[in-house]
From Swiss-Prot:
Location in or out of the cell: Cell projection, Cilium, Flagellum
Name the UniProt record assigns to this protein: Polyamine-modulated factor 1-binding protein 1
Species, as recorded: Mus musculus (Mouse)
Cellular component annotations (GO), alphabetically ordered: cytoplasm; sperm flagellum; sperm head; sperm head-tail coupling apparatus
Tissue spec: Expressed in the testis.
GO biological process: gene expression; protein localization; protein-containing complex assembly; regulation of protein localization; spermatid development; spermatogenesis
Phylogenetic placement of the source organism: Eukaryota, Metazoa, Chordata, Craniata, Vertebrata
Segments of skewed composition (Basic and acidic residues): 545-556, 571-582
Function: Required for normal spermatogenesis. It functions as a scaffold protein that attaches the sperm head-tail connecting piece to the nuclear envelope, thus maintaining sperm head and tail integrity. May also be involved in the general organization of cellular cytoskeleton.
Renumbered residue ranges of the record's region Disordered: 545-582
Amino acid sequence: MLKLKGELRTAKGLKNEAGERDRDVSNLNSKLLSLQLDIKNLHDVCKRQGKTLQENQLCVEEAMLKANHNKKQAQTLVFTDNQMDFRVNKQYHLRQLQQLKKKLLTLQQELEFRTQELQASYCSLLQYQSILEKQTSDLLVLHRHCKLKEDEVILYEEEMGNHSKSTGEKLHLAQEQLALAGDKILSLERSLNLYRDKYQTSLSNIELLECQVKMLEGELSGLIGQDPENKGDHPKVRIYTSPCVIQEHQETLKRLSEVWQKVSEQDDLIQELRNKLACSNSLVLEREEALIKLQAEFASYTATHRHPPTSSEDCEDITKILKHLQEQKDSQCLHVEEYQNLVKDLRMELEAVSEQKKKIMKDMMKLELDLHGLREETSCVIEKKDKETVFLQYRLQDLQQQYTESQKLSLKKDKLLQDKDERLHELEKNLMQVQNSLREKEAELEKLQCTTKELDTSLQEARQSTSKIDCEALRAEIQKLKDSLEEAREQLKVSDQNLTQSKEEAHLSASSLEDAHRKIENCLLQDKQKEEVIKDLQSQLHKLQKESSKIEEERKHNRQRLQELSSELSEGQRRLSNAEKEKSLLQKTLDEDEKKIDELFHSTQVSEQKQRELTNSIRKLEEELLEIKGLLEEKREQLKKSKEQEKALEEEIEALRQEAKRKEKMAKEHLRKLDEEKENLQAELTSRSSHLDSSLNKYNSSQKVIQELNAEIARQKDSIMILQTQLDSAIQKEKNCFQNMVSKEAYEELVRKSGNCQDDLTQALEKLTQATSETKSLNRSLQQTQERKAQLEDEIAAYEERMKKLNMELKKLQGFQQQSEQEVHNFDKKLEEMSNQVLQWQRQHQSDLKMLAAKESQLREFQEEMATLRESLLADEKEPYSPPAKLTPKETCRHHRENDQIMNNVEQWAKEQKIANEKLGNKLREQVKYIAKLTGEKDHLHNVMVHLQQENKKLKNEIEEKKLKAGNPRICVKAFPPNKLEPSQKGKLCCALGWRGIPQDLTPKTDHKYMGLPHSSGSSYC
């Protein structure tokens, strides 16, 4: 609930912060708008000034035009007056221009400044907008979180309401039980008064123990402080702690302190519960002793009063006493039951508290880990800062180098500027000289104009006075003067042009000067920026140095504080020792008899308490022994299981080895068969090639025979043609003979000749038919041989592909064989490692058994010591009123020391046993994890084997299918029959004979299994 309230408060605070940021953003927006308005105004002003500049330029141009016009007029009439006006106007306009330029420069600077401000404000606005967006998203998330937390609060309130109801009911029951327990408390208060004295003595012991604990805590804190100091005092490490890391460290320290407080509270609770248990056990023992006494009294009473009573009144008294005793016994039994219930409850509470303590210890461990992580982070941060400082130093050096370079450049530019200034001075001097020459020429012009006026006047006078001849001479002189005037004007024009050129050069030099000034200003600005960067870096360095100095001062202060605290502690210890000495002296001055009695009583009580504690510790130790035995049994079972698994693994390894051997054998057989197949294929190839050669030879011979037959046919055709011509001639002769009436003998001869010719013709025709049939058969055989050749070529290509595939598969098989061998080798190595580990575990088990035996022997020794202590206690109880002079305080102190030593030994033994048990548990867990890992590997190997077997089956099926496919087309004839055989006979021969010398099934039969041979996709045995 408190956490939820705190989160709600933080959420509200974040909302307020978001509102403030919104206001800041609105203010910034308003500022931005005002800046934009200012910039607009500036732009307007710039535009206006630009317009005025343009107007001024137009005015200047007009003035220039006017000046030119005035010049022309001056050349004709009043040159000097207009020139003066022009100069005045020119100077005035130049002043105006300079003023306007200055204004323009100032405005441009303002514009640049405003634009920079705008850019900066725009960047800040963008940053604020991004921050606002982030914060809005964070606010939304927080709002959702708050809603969820409110729902959780409602649920918690409902649960709290239910809990309060249940607690109210429980309270009611508890109040009833309290009312019942009130009576018991009255009886217990009496016994409490007796134990108050004991409590006070135990309190004094507790105070002493608390002082010791504080001392130990101080030493621990000193050691903890010394550890980081020792780490920090290392010369190679320089610690620069950032404030965030220090805050985290402080938070972790706070958490640690809270956890320590919780631990101390839990320890106090445990102590209180133990005290309660001890009290209840003591009460139970007292009640049991009282019962035993009552039983003894009753037995003595029955023994003394065996005879029946004489009177009825005595009987009634006895019965009343008996009833009263029975009631007391019942009440005591009830008390005993209640105390037993109380003991059970206290045990339950003790278990809960121990669980809480364990949780707290876990939290402590986590916090310590966090502390360790924070220390590592601080070291990382320090390393980063060191790197940053080194980087900044390098940057500083670079900037200083740049600064020196820029200074050198500025010096060079200054020199250039000085040169330019000198040139400007020279140009100005030249200008002055030109202006002086112009003035001289103007004076000469004025003189010439005066002379012309005088000449005009003299001319008029001469016209009036002299004759025409004088006028002509004067006119010639006037023309000469006019020519000289024109030459002077031309010279003036040339001088004007020179002036304009010099002015342009002056303007160019002025512009170059301005550019140089601007560049110098830029360089100076860059230098200033670099100086500022250097200053910032130096300030950062100074800050870092200051921080480091502050940290060192804090360290020194902490060390001084630690030294002061240690000195105060030592003084306090001295004072304590002095006080203890004074106490001992004062106690010695007291009555020795009373002391001895008190000490004896106290020692008996302490011994009883210690005896009870020892019994409890022995019970705990016995329980722990039982647990250890159970763990040992589990270990043995696990060892048995691991041995069984080892055996199974060994069997599997042997099986794998056998399978590997089988695979090797199978691979060798497969290789041998493949070699045989290869040889068979090569033999088949040679036979096929020889068969092809023979068929080619036959084909060539048949082609030759066909050519011969064609030649014979051509000859026979020629002979037939000759015979036909002869027949025709004979028929004509017959006709002629008939016509000429030839004799019968000639006719008969002719008939015989014609019959012979016909016989020859029929024979030739028969031969032709035979030749045509032979050619047809030869053509058929040729086609068959060509088809067979194509088939053979296809088969050869297929065989070559198959050979390639077989070679590839062979390589793959060899690779897989190597892999399997490597796997077997690795598995052997793993087996060896496992066997070594098993041997180690067996040794550890034996050592654990030895440790257990040693612990059992220690337990027996402790039990014997306990028995001796009990005997001594019983002896002390039997002689409680022995004279005090016999027991000296030294003996009592020795007795106390022995008891303390025994207790310390028992506690140390219990701690050692706990540590050993934890170590054993960790080892067992590690062994279980390793066994699980091995089983996983075994399952993986089994899956791989199954997969390989499936692939082998697939391969086998594919090989058998391809055998069946490849078996049908392999039946063919070895050699061709002779040429005169018919095709039907040839086919019969092919079917009957088959291919001799070549096995009909080229692929070997693979009936056995291919174990461990993987099947690559695409590979086949066809």
